[in-house]
């Protein structure tokens, strides 16, 4: 495994076209293709998304949680996002149930 400083430099000097600060590239570098995620505060489906690149280009499975329903129309227009998104308060969800529903349990 790379040292944290080398890993940081590798990620810092790359830029993602999707996430704000390379969070997607950081996760991809650490875990590779086919990972899992829970994205709380998903926001827009593509712009500033920490999970778009992972889901669409690298076969990650997971789900998002977003309370701001005004971005739902953007998700409806983004068919490449196949993983579930829950339009709810993240503090009230039954995550164990959702993980099972989405076949994410190991």
Model-assigned labels for residue ranges:
Residues 2, 68, 80, 103-105:
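Short, structured coil/loop segments at alpha-helix boundaries
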Residues 15-97:
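SAM cofactor-binding core of SAM-dependent methyltransferases
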Residues 1-18, 22:
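Membrane-proximal basic amphipathic "stem/tether" segments
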């Amino acid at each position: 495994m790379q040292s944290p400083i080398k890993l940081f430099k590798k990620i810092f000097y790359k830029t993602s076209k999707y996430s704000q600060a390379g969070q997607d590239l950081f996760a991809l570098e650490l875990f590779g293709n086919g990972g899992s995620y829970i994205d709380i505060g998903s926001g827009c489906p593509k712009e500033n998304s920490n999970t778009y690149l992972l889901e669409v280009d690298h076969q990650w499975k997971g789900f998002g949680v977003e309370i701001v329903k005004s971005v739902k129309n953007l998700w409806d227009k983004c068919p490449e996002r196949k993983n579930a998104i829950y339009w709810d308060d993240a503090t009230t969800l039954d995550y164990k149930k959702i993980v099972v529903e989405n076949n994410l349990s190991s």
